[in-house]
């Protein structure tokens, strides 16, 4: 579900510099996983997603603070909570993806055709990669290249005046 939602609203959702997709999209993935484990009915799952729409959060303004990684934990917690509540009869907007919800967290109209294509297409898990370093994926190429440069041209930290890296 996360891959499908991402297909509909990325890269604008992230690139507009406001949203932290781990928190805003991750909550739906957590609810889907929890719902599958809990054996939610389709109706309960739709209610869980409706609850998630009200709980999704994560802003790029928190990057560099303790609140940034907390968005991932909150997405997991909120997705699990939404699934548990829905399994106990709690309702949310069951037709949330038929509304303009996704348009509101994107700078353009969400591409629902892409969402459906990814939802019913190959599973996104086959595209997953392990992160080699404990930091944002866009910085990995810089780390790899710095390691290559240092291997070819050893320097001490005192010899390096400045490193400039612009991942975007």
Each model region followed by its residue ranges:
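Short glycine-enriched loops at secondary-structure junctions
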Residues: 1-5, 108-111
């Amino acid at each position: 579900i996360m891959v499908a939602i991402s297909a509909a609203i990325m890269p604008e959702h992230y690139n507009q510099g406001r949203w932290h997709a781990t928190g805003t999209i991750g909550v739906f993935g957590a609810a889907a996983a929890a719902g599958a484990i809990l054996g939610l009915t389709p109706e309960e799952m739709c209610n869980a997603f409706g609850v998630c729409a009200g709980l999704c959060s994560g802003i790029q303004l928190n990057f560099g603070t303790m609140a940034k990684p907390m968005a991932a934990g909150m997405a997991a917690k909120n997705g699990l909570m939404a699934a548990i509540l829905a399994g106990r009869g709690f309702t949310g907007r069951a037709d949330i993806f038929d509304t303009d919800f996704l348009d509101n967290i994107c700078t353009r109209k969400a591409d629902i055709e892409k969402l459906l294509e990814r939802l019913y297409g190959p599973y996104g898990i086959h595209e997953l990669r392990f992160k080699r370093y404990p930091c944002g994926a866009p910085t990995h190429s810089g780390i790899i290249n710095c390691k290559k440069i240092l291997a070819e041209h050893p320097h001490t930290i005192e010899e390096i005046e400045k490193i400039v890296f612009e991942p975007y």
